[in-house]
């Protein structure tokens, strides 16, 4: 790709956007020099790596690259024998730590991001060097006392001397005789020596060493003789500490250089990972996706099958990065066509469309997702050449047309099979007839060389090529005739009018001038242009009709949805009513259970035949109540499922009384209640308990009753269990208390069902269970008689019981 093509398509801006999303200086440098992949397979692999990095980004997992500075310069200086400064060593330590942490992160995610892990696996797993440097050097860059025992000792000696000197100088300042010779009662440090501000006139009164003087010369900074010895000792201690610090820095730099190869390797890997993470962020910001990468010639051979390329919802990436509203376009080149001729009004987006394709081709070559939707397909173009901006050639004193032809000449020389050629306003800026002939010849030459070509034009002769030659295809950018404005949408398969007169009207040229131009155009040929404008008008009319049809369809769909919603509301009301009936039934059942429990308690307290008979009668009444309530609930469910909702509850309307399972006629309505005639009776029921029966609703109700009756009949006709199976109770293994409770429940059920006898299996055992059972049977009001089983019945291991009737 020539520098000119990259510049004209805006490739440097893409690289700048990528670099801005990298965090390492080395990563940014690598992004700005991002290479193009040599093969289609390499491009697929690069896109897959970006896809894995994007997966990490979507999981909010950022690579741990913090703190790594521009260490390339540090490593180079150390390799030449230089001693690194403390902060430089800290940055190198950050590199070692980032390498270990990044390796650990990607190893843990190896199953999700296998390619990234393969790239990161050579990273150094140990951060021992980083630990050593960070223990010796504080984040501020100061060398820590922990760096060595010698340094700690020298610094402690220095601190002790500072304390002694400060105490001595403060004693001198407090001396009244000394104060008479001082400019002020303070001390300062000059040349690492404690000094006093002595009046120049009192110089001989304060013996010592003069280290400095004020600008006026009236004040001398004197180190008193009594402090010189301590000052010398402090200088020696500081020198020892400084020498130890330099020794530590030399030692750490040496340790760094001993591992310099690994550090350089780690830096290269981290920079590559940083670029991949930046690529993932860029793809996310562009809503970009990896296209299917085709070989350079897939679908582009004359007579070949399939699409040469297809970019769905394509957007110009630079416009997206600028935050502008971008109208997406669907760009496709179908075989056998090899050239796409884009026409339409000025400012309609023709140049944007073809440069977006060119940038997409470059991004794919560099392994970057393109600003198009999933499902897009794009060849791995061997070369991309563009002539969309000749302003640079104008500085060479070339005319616009001459500069354009020079660019075309360069492209003709470089056009090879599998290349992509982009030309904006081909052969414009000259006589239209000659320009059209030249443009057609250029296009044919490029196509014959095996290139895929995208051009923009206003020349009618080029628009007509696709009508007679399958190697060419038309596309147009839309124009809204009512608003006199472009739509920026690309439409495939047809040419577009330049709409120059409409654009002139839009920018505000005088109306008489515009009308004169329109009349002149109509009277002086331009048949293809007029046909294109008529075609645009017809398209606009059809689009309006389609919008009207879609609006009517949407209205019908919404009406149908409202009807369904109303029906669902009615059915929901039925279900809620059934639920309320179920709750009422549950309350009745609970009350009945409580009553039965009370009867049983009384029966156990007074075990008489009369009491048992009364209990059985009460149980029969309870069962009848439960059956009636269940029948009403079933009727309500049937009504909710099969009655046709509709109409309102008003006098004269036939309704189903859900809770009673009966039909009737509404006599009157009073608020939320209604009076209903059901046969010879009149009942007052809540309106919510009534379902209007309209049309076939009565048949549905009958059907519901018929089905309910059949189900009940089927239930009643169900074959009974094998003889004796329901009249047998096995109590082996139970404790006495459990046995008595089970036997009482068993006898109660059989007595209520009208059974005559039963068999209780208790086994032989120790005989205690059998004796407890028979003692209980002797006192039971349910039992008429009992005996040990016959031999064929199980002998004394069973007890046969005859129930009292």
From Swiss-Prot:
Chain positions covered by the region annotation Disordered: 705-724
Keyword Nuclease: yes
Pfam family, one: MutS_V
Matches recorded under InterPro entries: DNA_mismatch_repair_MutS_C (IPR000432), DNA_mismatch_repair_MutS_core (IPR007696), DNA_mismatch_repair_MutS_sf (IPR036187), MSSS (IPR046893), MutS (IPR045076), MutS2 (IPR005747), P-loop_NTPase (IPR027417), Smr_dom (IPR002625)
EC number: 3.1.-.-, 3.6.4.-
UniProt GO molecular function: ATP binding; ATP hydrolysis activity; ATP-dependent DNA damage sensor activity; endonuclease activity; mismatched DNA binding; ribosomal large subunit binding; rRNA binding
ATP-binding in keyword set: yes
Binding site for ATP: 344-351
HAMAP family tied to this protein: MutS2
This protein's name: Endonuclease MutS2
Organism of origin: Anaeromyxobacter sp. (strain Fw109-5)
This protein's encoding gene: mutS2
